[in-house]
């Protein structure tokens, strides 16, 4: 949301901090029995505990200390630009989009998406299906530019391999 110029009432987070939760602005107080006043309104699979909170706090400190948010932005922009170049070269997919580590592109149909996922897998790239026709990457926060270049090379190989069979 930081990129869109809006201030949300509630934000959920998870995955990268290995724990999940929400944080909220003052508007939540408009609900008399909100989740922060009446316990057990929101629960997670594991219920949360002190160890989870300490671990999450340490992850956040490391993310801030090592400027990981800036790294993720730079690497993500590099990957999106590279995927757009591959799109122009091979015409195998459309709608390259992304922000930070959330990056995807769209195939013409579900069968082509399945073929692309298989081609990427043969190149030792794990990608995920998304929606009906899209492919998305789940990138680590500590991905380097060198890692990103390797991802793009392997994606280019997978795209060219598919283009040769069409």
Question: What would you call each of these model-derived segments?
Answer:
Residues 1-166:
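Conserved N-terminal phosphate-binding loop of PLP-dependent enzymes in the Aspartate aminotransferase
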């Amino acid at each position: 949301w930081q990129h869109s110029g809006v201030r949300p009432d509630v934000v959920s987070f998870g995955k990268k901090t290995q724990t999940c939760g929400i944080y909220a602005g003052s508007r939540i107080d408009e609900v008399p029995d909100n989740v922060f006043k009446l316990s057990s309104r929101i629960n997670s699979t594991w219920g949360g505990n002190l160890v989870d909170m300490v671990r999450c706090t340490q992850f956040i400190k490391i993310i801030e200390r090592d400027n990981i948010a800036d790294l993720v932005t730079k690497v993500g922009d590099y990957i999106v630009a590279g995927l757009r170049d591959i799109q122009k070269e091979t015409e195998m997919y459309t709608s390259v989009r992304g922000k930070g580590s959330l990056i995807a592109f769209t195939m013409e149909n579900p069968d082509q998406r399945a073929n692309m996922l298989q081609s990427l897998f043969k190149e030792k790239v794990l990608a995920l299906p998304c929606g009906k026709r899209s492919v998305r990457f789940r990138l680590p926060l500590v991905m380097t530019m060198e890692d990103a270049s390797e991802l793009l090379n392997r994606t280019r190989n997978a795209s060219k391999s598919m283009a040769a069979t069409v």
